[in-house]
Swiss-Prot record:
Segments of skewed composition (Basic residues): 537-553, 568-577
InterPro entries: Homeodomain-like_sf (IPR009057), SANT/Myb (IPR001005)
Composition skew (Acidic residues), residue ranges: 271-294, 448-480, 510-533, 586-609
Domain Myb-like: 332-379
Compositionally biased tracts (Basic and acidic residues): 786-795
Positions with biased composition (Low complexity): 295-315, 625-636, 666-733
Entry protein name: Myb-like protein V
Species whose genome carries this gene: Dictyostelium discoideum
Length: 803
């Protein structure tokens, strides 16, 4: 037979003359095999976006694996294939594959051998289209197909050997009439071939017109064959049609149960055969046994066999009944109307499957779980609800559904408000009932105290009816005891009025505890109330004095705030202490008057020396000034005391004395505040008077030489000037007798010698030389001349006093 008669090549011009015929189920099944093996069954996963991140393109994972089953496709298709258009569709499918497998090569080699005839291979349309690049496929697939063609041309001998007598492979069965049917399939389904629903941007097509694989999000598959479901047992050999498989689960279970039943029956038969063989062996070994024993054994074995067969049959029946009861047959496939109603319900109501079942599927046999599963499958296929709605509804229908959803939400909100109002009214009624019940209980217990009525009501409400009598008796006893205690308290309060409470601001935590204890004692002891009040006040004063922080201010002068603190502390002192301080102050005033008579005449020299001392005192550390503060007293009038200075140019004439008195009067008005800035005047509590060791006022400067290096401003002309740094303690002067003039002179000489022996001579001389106060009218003397002048001053003082 000539190949031209058998092979009918359909040209593109003959499409119009083809009669429109219904697609046979066999042809549809063949096409579905190709379609689902390439797109559905093997789970071709195109690149998609999740959370705005592009998933890296897999190396076609299962798409490479599906070529293993290409031989199964050839067994169903290539033997009946005779159309170029279906080959073009197949090549378009290959256009989505990046790395074809060896099985593809074998498939194409068989295909070319099928198309090969004596000399017409070049005239075939598919080959011509491949060479001219007329097929809308990628260049990579074109190059791949050209490579296979080159291989085929290089091996013509093998192709000729494979050809039969007719020049065609013997394994292929030619069916010329199917060419027209395949053309009908292509014309009917080519518009339903996979096209992307969503593309990242418009420039996502290749030059050939195909879509770029990386730009495609997901594909929309045809609805003609989407209801087909294929069961894969791992080997991809068993493909079941939708009629055989009902919603996946029941059919799987039934198939598995049938297989289990077969396995169990086989096992039982094997067990029976083993038992029979064992029995035969036993009979052969026991030939010498009695006939009775043999007959008994045979009867037992036969009984065991029958029992085993019965048990196996019963088990199989029970399993089948259980499977039928657990997995009843579900309704058939989903129709478009059911899918539309499900999508509409989800858009209006939301994911409330029970309500959707009641409102939209009340008459059908579908369950809420099935509705949920169907919606999940639609989401996997289309994506969001919007895309699902676009696939099943028009724009006008979608707008109407959205309006219905808004109305449904408004109704639900109104229902919620009505429920809230009803709940609030019910709560008000319940509270009114409870208040009425509590008022009834209060009327019974009016005779009891007001403090215990709430407790009794709560107890009466909570207790059971059996324990009410016991609770009432206990409450009566408690009421009697409380009444007695109140009567006692009223009597005590009427007899003795309570002491006024002190201010809370001055009370520390310790005092509050002591006050509470003391208040308890006042209730017991009525007669001693006045004494206790006096004791409490003294305790508060002492605690306030102790709690006040003791801070010794160093490197600073006494401020006005310290004077206020001293006055506040002096008020807190007891009466005998105040009397002693008054005597001390009077004695100090008398001594100050005597010292003022012996001050210097020139005010400028005195002020310049004081300024120097102030500058040096600011530089001295706190540890050095603290030694002086320990010997001071807590009197406010000491701030106005002036240092005793012996004038070096005093004469015995009366004129000089008059002039001196005038200067003193002026000086008292000019410099009353300067001595307040000395660091030695910092006050302390009167408890430190024990540290004052000297007995006479002239020997007090002996305390200060503890830190001799920090007093460079001391001039040798005024040896008694140090007495200003340490205040006088007049308390011990009352016991001493008045000293004579000679004794005072001797003491001054001793003190002067001590001061001269100090290591400050060099620093004093330097201060004299480097002093900035050279503009004064007074001529400064050197230390040597001052020593001479001091002796002369002593004589003049003695002469003046004698006169």
């Amino acid at each position: 037979m000539d190949t031209s008669q058998d092979i009918v090549i359909a040209d593109s011009n003959t499409t119009d003359n083809v009669e429109v015929r219904s697609i046979s189920p066999r042809v549809a099944a063949i096409f579905d095999d190709i379609y689902y093996f390439f797109y559905k069954e093997i789970d071709i996963e195109f690149t998609r976006y999740t959370d705005n991140k592009l998933i890296s393109e897999r190396m076609y994972g299962k798409r490479i694996d599906f070529f293993i089953s290409i031989l199964y496709i050839t067994r169903n298709i290539i033997e009946s294939y005779n159309n170029v258009e279906l080959l073009k569709c197949f090549f378009k499918m290959l256009n989505h594959c990046s790395k074809p497998n060896e099985n593809i090569e074998n498939f194409l080699m068989k295909l070319f051998t099928y198309l090969h005839s004596d000399s017409i291979l070049d005239n075939i349309e598919i080959i011509r289209a491949l060479r001219d690049n007329k097929l809308k496929i990628r260049r990579e697939t074109q190059d791949y197909l050209n490579q296979i063609l080159d291989k085929f041309y290089k091996k013509p001998k093998e192709a000729e050997e494979r050809d039969g007598d007719d020049g065609l492979p013997m394994e292929f069965v030619r069916q010329d009439t199917l060419s027209k049917l395949f053309r009908e399939i292509y014309n009917d389904i080519r518009d339903l071939l996979p096209e992307p629903i969503q593309v990242r941007h418009l420039l996502s097509r290749n030059i050939d017109g195909t879509f770029k694989l990386k730009e495609v999000l997901f594909y929309e598959f045809d609805r003609v064959s989407e209801d087909h479901w294929f069961y894969d047992d791992g080997k991809q050999s068993n493909i079941y049609s939708p009629e055989e498989i009902n919603n996946n689960t029941n059919n799987k279970n039934s198939v598995l149960l049938d297989a289990n039943d077969k396995n169990e029956n086989n096992n039982n038969n094997n067990d029976d055969a083993d038992d029979a063989a064992a029995d035969d062996a036993d009979d052969a070994d026991d030939d010498d046994m009695d006939d009775e024993s043999d007959s008994n054994n045979n009867n037992k074995n036969s009984n065991n066999k029958n029992s085993n067969n019965k048990n196996s049959n019963e088990n199989n029946k029970n399993k089948r009944t259980k499977s039928s009861s657990k997995s009843p047959q579900l309704p058939g496939l989903w129709t478009d109307e059911e899918c539309r109603s499900l999508i509409k319900a989800v858009m209006i109501i939301g994911h409330r499957w029970i309500k959707i079942k009641e409102d939209y599927y009340s008459t059908s046999k579908r369950k809420p779980s099935q509705l949920k599963d169907k919606m999940r499958s639609l989401r996997k296929r289309y994506g969001d609800i919007k895309n699902i709605a676009i696939a099943y509804f028009t724009k006008a229908e979608i707008i109407e559904i959205e309006k219905l959803a808004v109305l449904f939400q408004q109704k639900e909100e109104a229902q919620k408000l009505a429920k809230e109002k009803i709940d609030s009214l019910s709560n008000i009624k319940s509270t009114s009932n409870t208040s009425a019940a509590s008022g009834h209980n209060k009327g019974k217990n009016e005779n009891n105290d007001s403090d215990e009525e709430v407790d009794q009501d709560s107890d009466n409400d909570s207790n059971n009816e059996d324990n009410q009598n016991e609770s009432e008796s206990e409450n009566e006893d408690e009421n009697d005891n409380n009444e007695k205690e109140k009567e006692k308290r009223n009597k005590k309060n009427s007899a003795v009025p309570p002491a006024p409470a002190p201010p809370k601001k001055l009370k520390p935590i310790e005092e509050e505890e002591s006050d509470e204890e003391h208040n308890d004692s006042e209730e017991d002891s009525q007669e001693d109330s006045e004494e206790n009040e006096y004791i409490i006040k003294q305790k508060r004063k002492s605690n306030q004095i102790k709690s006040s922080p003791k801070k010794l201010k160093t490197n600073q002068s006494v401020d006005k705030s310290e004077d206020v603190n001293q006055s506040h502390k002096s008020k807190l002192k007891s009466k005998p202490q105040r009397k002693v301080e008054k005597e001390e102050s009077e004695k100090e005033e008398s001594e100050e008057e005597e010292s003022e008579e012996e001050e210097e005449e020139d005010d400028e020299d005195y002020e310049s020396e004081e300024d120097k001392k102030k500058k040096k005192s600011k530089k001295t550390p706190s540890n050095q000034t603290s030694t002086h503060t320990t010997t001071t007293t807590t009197t406010t009038r000491k701030s106005n005391t002036k240092p005793i200075v012996v004038s070096s140019e005093e004469d015995s004439s009366d004129e000089e004395e008059k002039r001196r008195t005038k200067t003193l009067s002026k000086k008292s008005n000019q410099t009353p505040t300067t001595p307040t800035k000395k660091p030695s005047q910092t006050p302390t509590t009167p408890t430190k008077k024990s540290n004052q060791t000297p007995t006479t006022p002239t020997k007090k400067p002996s305390q200060t030489p503890i830190t001799p290096t920090k007093k460079p401003n001391q001039t040798p002309t005024t040896p008694t000037k140090k007495s200003s740094q340490t205040p006088i303690t007049p308390t011990k002067k009352s016991t001493n007798r008045p000293k004579s003039i000679e004794e005072e002179e001797n003491e001054q000489e001793e003190q002067h010698e001590k001061n001269q022996n100090k290591p400050l001579k060099k620093r004093v001389s330097e201060d004299w030389s480097n002093s900035s106060d050279k503009t004064s009218n007074k001529r400064f003397k050197s230390p040597e001349t001052l020593n001479k002048d001091s002796k002369e001053n002593k004589k003049t003082i003695s002469n003046s006093r004698r006169k």
